[in-house]
Amino acid sequence: MRILGLITEYNPFHNGHLHHLQESKKISKSTHTVAVMSGHFLQRGEPALIHKWARAQMAVDAGVDLVLELPTLYACASAEFFSHGAVSILNQMGVVDALCFGSELGHIEALKQVATVLINSPESFEISLKKYLQEGIAFPKARSKALIDHFSLEDLSSYGMTTEKMIALLKNPNNILGIEYLKALALTKSKIQPYTITRKAAAYHSTELTLNITSATAIRNHLFNTGNLNEMIHAIPPSTYEILSTCFNKDGGPIFANDLGLTILSMIRRMTPQEIAKILDVGEGLENRIFQCANQSNRLDEFCQCVKSKRYTLTRIQRICMRILLDIQFPLMNQATHASTGLYGRILAFNDRGREIIKLAQKKSSFPFITKINQYTPPNSFTKNLLDLDIRATNLYALAVKNNAFSKGEQDHLTSPYYRKELT
C-alpha cells in the first residue's frame, strides 16, 4: 500500500481537480488516496458553495478514497497556517507516503529553493521585505517582490530556471501554496515525499468558462452571476453535477459571503474600534476603517471593497470577517502554532480503500479518527477548542442555507460520513 496525500478545498470538485487526482496517483505510484479538505469556510475567507459532506462525496465519487476535514482554524487562515495544519494532519497519520500539488510550472526543485529561502530568511531578503512593507505594500506582494530581488542576484541555471521564470513563479497563487506545503514539510522534518504536476489549462483565478477545464473561481463567479448550473456541465464530472443539482434543487446552496453579510455587519456594528483592534490580523489603524465602512455598507462585498487598500488585501479583509463571525481568538491561534499534537481526522467521506487507510493508520499511530462527534472525547483543551470551532462554523454556516432542515444547528452531531461501497 502506498498512500498519497492531497490538500484541497473542492469548491466545487471540477475537471481540473479530476486531472490533478489522476496524474498525482500516476506520478507518485500510489494505490490509496487521502484528501485533507476545508470544511464550511475556506482559505480566502469565504463560505463554501455547498456543505462539506456533499463536497467530500464529490471527491470520493471521483476517486479519492478518504476525505478528512481540515479544522476551521487552519482552513480559514493564511497560506502558511493553512499548509501547516494540513501537513500536520498528514504527518500525524503516520502512513502517508507522498503529497502532490498542482503548480503553474510543475518544477519541484525551483519551488524547494524558494521554500528554503523563506525558512532561512537571508539578510538580503529581510532587508528587501522590510523596505517594501514600509512602502505600504501588502505582505504577500512585498514578500514576492523581496524574493524576486533575492533571486535576481543568483544563478538559477542549476535549477533549470531563468529570472523571468522565477518572477512568473512567484506571482502565481498556486505556486505560493505549493511553496508553503514544502516549507511545512521541511519545518516538521516530514518523511512525506513531495511531488508537483503542472496545472492544466485554466489559471487559478481565471474567470473564463473554458471548454472541459476551468477554474473553481470561474465556476463560482458564474453561479453567483447567473445561478445556471447547466452552462458549466462541460467543466465538472457527472457526479459533481448531480450532487450540485440535487443540493441546489433542495435550496441547500449555492452559498456566498453576502448570505452571511448581515450577520457579520451586525456583529461589527456592535463593536467599538478598540474591540475591533483586538481581532487577529487587525492593526495599524485598520480598526477605524473597519468601523467606518461597517456603518456605510449594507452588503458584505461592498464592505470588503470599502476596507481594502494597498496594504490590506481583499482576502485578508474577508478572513477578518470570518474571524469575527466565528469568534476566532488569538490564544487559540497561538496554541495551534506551537502544538505538535492534538489534531484529529474528522471523516467526511470514504470508500473501502479509505477504510484500509484508517485501519493502517490506527496500527501505526495514535492519531484519532472521528466518525461520530458524540462518541469522541477530546484529550485536552486545545483539541476541544478546535472541535468546538468546527461545530460553531457549521452552525453559523447553516444560517445561510434556505432549506429549513439544514439551517437548523447541530448538523455535525446529526450527519454521518458518506460511504461509497466499491463494486467487487
Curated annotation (Swiss-Prot):
Q: A Pfam family name for this chain?
A: HIGH_NTase1
Q: What is its EC number?
A: 6.3.4.-
- What GO terms in the biological process aspect are recorded for it? tRNA modification
Name where it mostly resides: cytoplasm
GO CC terms of this entry? cytoplasm
Q: Where does ATP bind?
A: 7-20, 102, 174, 199
Q: Name one GO molecular function term.
A: ATP binding
Reaction(s) the record says it catalyses: cytidine(34) in elongator tRNA(Met) + acetate + ATP = N(4)-acetylcytidine(34) in elongator tRNA(Met) + AMP + diphosphate
Keyword annotations of the record: ATP-binding, Cytoplasm, Ligase, Nucleotide-binding, RNA-binding, tRNA processing, tRNA-binding
Q: Where in the cell is it found?
A: Cytoplasm
Q: What InterPro entries does its record include?
A: Rossmann-like_a/b/a_fold, tRNA(Met)_cyd_acetate_ligase
Similarity remark: Belongs to the TmcAL family.
What functional role does this protein have?
Catalyzes the formation of N(4)-acetylcytidine (ac(4)C) at the wobble position of elongator tRNA(Met), using acetate and ATP as substrates. First activates an acetate ion to form acetyladenylate (Ac-AMP) and then transfers the acetyl group to tRNA to form ac(4)C34.
**NCBIfam families (alphabetical):** PRK13670.1
The entry's protein name is tRNA(Met) cytidine acetate ligase
> What's the source species for this entry?
Alkaliphilus metalliredigens (strain QYMF)
| Phylogenetic classification of the source organism | Bacteria, Bacillati, Bacillota, Clostridia, Peptostreptococcales
